[in-house]
A protein has these predicted regions:
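Pocket-lining segment of extracytoplasmic ligand-binding domains
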Residues: 87-88, 161-249
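Bacterial N-terminal signal peptides that target proteins for export
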Residues: 1-9
């Protein structure tokens, strides 16, 4: 009798082990996400992929670098599942495109104004920005206004990397940059004239087609869950995050550590955004786009999935 009981328990454990192995061997679902550049704004996706956070949610995340207009076009065509190009997606949705932002990974602008050694705010005559009319341009105007010097010329360089290069080449008096260029410049002795970490705007999110959200609701929940867990892990695990910045973005230890200090201030671990802030951003975009008609927020965002996930994991 005793041998039969032992044999029965052995069978149960073998069956349980087989079921676990089967669950673990279930193939991951390929999910494609476009980002405008391999930039630190989108580090939650890169870090989460490297740390296996997305894989734990059953997602084989493929991150594709693609210019925002192409990324949004591919998304609308159904050629991929998500884009992180929040700003352009918002503008497209504003004009009627069936896109919805479902999570915000950054709602504080990560720009800093860095000047030439020995430069003072009053002596700044020109500032390098990645593009006229861009968030970088808006951030530069904001900082210069705070410094009391609005009589400056803004020079478009196409990319933040080019703005940083222009600063090093002494082609400009100052440049508006984001991490890691902020830390690279400041640690090299360039003066920091201020930042926009307190300015609320859209600088990264998770966007999907409306039809996809209706058809693949559970998959979208898994994507949101992984994104939130990745952001939380970045903030709570400094050693791992700094090590990843060195490895994944080829940053020197001191630059990685200082970059992490900035990231910790701007990563939106909640994934959400306050309605008044969202309305202010919407009004700004309407003015820029020449839209005068009333636009409901639910034409641009669908945060119901995010809030379901947060309730599920006990986030408040």
């Amino acid at each position: 009798m005793k041998k039969k009981i032992i044999s029965t328990f052995a069978c149960v454990f073998i069956l349980a082990g087989w079921q676990t192995a089967q669950a673990q061997s279930k193939p991951l679902e390929k999910v494609r996400l476009t980002v405008p550049a391999k930039a630190l704004t989108f580090v939650p996706y890169y870090f989460g992929k490297a740390q296996g956070i997305f894989a734990k949610e059953g997602i084989d995340l493929e991150i594709i670098v693609m210019r925002p207009p192409l990324g949004v076009t591919a998304l609308l065509a159904g050629d991929l599942e998500y884009t992180a190009a929040g700003g352009l997606s918002f503008r497209a949705a504003l004009k009627g495109a069936p896109l919805r932002t479902i999570t915000f990974i950054q709602t504080r602008l990560s720009f800093s104004l860095v000047g030439q050694p020995g430069m003072t705010p009053a002596r700044i005559h020109n500032v390098a920005v990645s593009g006229i009319g861009s968030l970088a341009h808006y951030a530069a105007i904001t900082v210069m206004k705070r410094l009391g010097n609005e009589k400056v010329t803004y020079i478009s360089t196409n990319t933040t990397a080019n703005s940083y290069t222009a600063l090093l080449a002494k082609s400009v008096d100052a440049a508006i940059v984001t991490p890691p260029y902020t830390s690279m410049a400041i640690l090299a002795g360039y003066p920091d004239f201020g930042n926009t970490f307190d300015v609320r705007d859209l600088q990264g999110g998770l966007v999907a087609r409306l039809q996809y959200l209706h058809e693949r609701r559970e998959q979208a929940r898994a994507m949101i869950r992984a994104t939130l867990r990745s952001m939380e892990s970045i903030v709570k695990n400094e050693v791992e995050a700094v090590a990843y910045l060195q490895r994944g973005f080829a940053l020197e230890p001191k630059i990685a550590a200082d970059t992490y200090r900035i990231l910790k201030q701007i990563v939106n671990t909640d994934g959400d955004i306050e309605e008044p802030v969202l309305k202010t951003i919407l009004e700004k975009l309407k003015q820029e786009s020449g839209v005068t008609a009333e636009v409901p927020l639910d034409r641009l965002v669908d945060l119901s999935l995010l809030r379901e996930v947060k309730a599920e994991v006990g986030k408040k």
